[in-house]
Amino acid sequence: MQIFRSIVTIIVVGTMAAMIFSLRSELAEAKAKSRGGEARSVIAGRPHVFSMSCKVPSCNKELNTKEGRARAVEWFRKNHITKLWLETYRHGERVETNLLEEERDAFRAAGFEVCGMITPTKFNDPPEGGEAPFVVCWSDPKALERLAEESVRAAKVFDTIIVDDFLFSHCDDRCARCKTLKEKRRLKDWGMFRREQMKEVACGPIIRAGRKANPNVQFIIKYPCWYQDWTKNGYDPVSGTRMFGACWIGTETRDANPDPAQGCCLMEAMDRLSGGKCGGGWYDALDCSPEKFVEQARYTILGGARESLVHCYDYLLAKDPGLTPFGEKADRSHACAEAFSREVDGLARLAELLRGAERTGWEWLVAFAGNNTGVSAHGFRKGGRRYVACVNTTDEQRMWTCAEGKPFRKVLSLPDEAAGRVMMDGPNNPAVGLMPHGLLVFEDPNDEEESDNGH
C-alpha cells in the first residue's frame, strides 16, 4: 500500500513496528498487518487531551502557593493544557500529603483534571558515605516496603496514578541478593529474572497495596522509549499492560536519534500491543532543540495518541529547570516552552483533524536517487476524503511535484502558514514546498477510493 501513488518514489518504513511486534510470537499477525498496511487503525473519536506533569520540586516550590498556581493556570489555559499529573515521589523526595491535596483541589477548582504520578527510584539504603542508587534493586525488602508506602500514599489522594518508567532493574551477578534469588528460581537468564521480578513488584507493592487504600485506584505503567532493551531489563508490554489495565509510552526523540519518527511508530505499535489500552504518549524537552521538541508533539499526535503528556512543568516553566536524569543542566527547555506556545494552536488543529480518522499508514519520501529526504508522509481518511500529513525533519527546504499534474489543496501547515507552500511550477506541474521542520497537511491529489484490499 502506498500513500503517494502519484508523487515521487517512496519506501515503506516498518522496521520499528516490526521490532516491537517480534517481542512475542503471538503478535505475528499484528506485525504482518502493520507492515503490509492492510489493517487500518482508527484514532479515538473523542477530543485530544493535552496534559502536563509536575515533578516533586515544582510541587514543593512554584506550585505550593496561590500566586504560583495562578501563574501556572494562566499558562496552562493559554496552551491548551486541561489535565495535570502531580508527582508524589521522585529520587528519595516526596510531596507531603496535605500539600498534594491542597494542590489537587486548587487545580480541580480551576477546571483541570488532576491525576498522580510516582517515579520509583532511590528506594534502597545508600552505601556508607554515598547516595542511594538511582535504579532500584527490587530484591531488597526495604525497597519494596518503601514503594508500597508511596503507592498507598498516592492512592489516598488520586484515583489515577501513572508509574514512571523506572521499574526496570540492572542487577546481575554482582548483586548477591538477586543472584541468589535467580539461582533459587532456576531462571535461565537475567532478562527472565527481571521480567518475573517486575510482575511481582507491580502486583504487590503497587497494585495490591494501592487498592487496599483505594479500591477504585487505577495504576498505569509507562513504558520507556528505549524499546530495544525492554525485555532484558524487565518490561513485557503485553503481560504488563494486562496486569495494570492501562499503559503509556514514551515518545521522546532526542537530537541524536537517527529515527526522528520513532515516537509515531511507538505510539501506534503500543496501541496495537495493548489492545487499545495505551492512554497516550509522553515526551520531554531533554537533549533536544526547540524544533525537535515540537516535532515530538507532532509525531505523538500522528501516531494516534489520545493524550499528549508534556513532561514537565519543571523543565519548561520553573525558574530553575534543574538537572536532567543524566545529571546535566536542562539548558534549552525554556526555549522549548516558547516553541510549544507558538505551535500548540496548530497542534490542536492537527489533533482535531485526525480525530476519528482512519490511519492508512506512513512512509519516508525518498528522492529519485533513492536517498531519504527526511520527510515522512502519513496517510489518513476522514469524511470520505483522503489526506496526507508531511513532516520535514531536516534543516533544509524540501519540494516535490505531482507527476499526474493534479492540484494539491492545503488543509493545515505548521508552525505557520508559510511553513508549507502549495504552488504551481508550470501549468501542469503542481508542486509543494515544505520549509525546514515544517508540517503540511493536504488532500491527496489522487483521491480515488481504494479497494477493500488496500491496493
Task: Annotate each predicted stretch with a short phrase.
Residues M1-T9:
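N-terminal Sec-pathway targeting helices
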Residues A17, R24-E26, L187:
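Helix-centric, low-specificity signal for extended rod-like, repetitive segments
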Residues F21-K33:
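Signal peptide processing junction and immediate N-terminal pro/mature segment
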Residues V411:
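Short glycine/Trp-rich loop-beta-loop segment that forms part of the substrate-binding cleft
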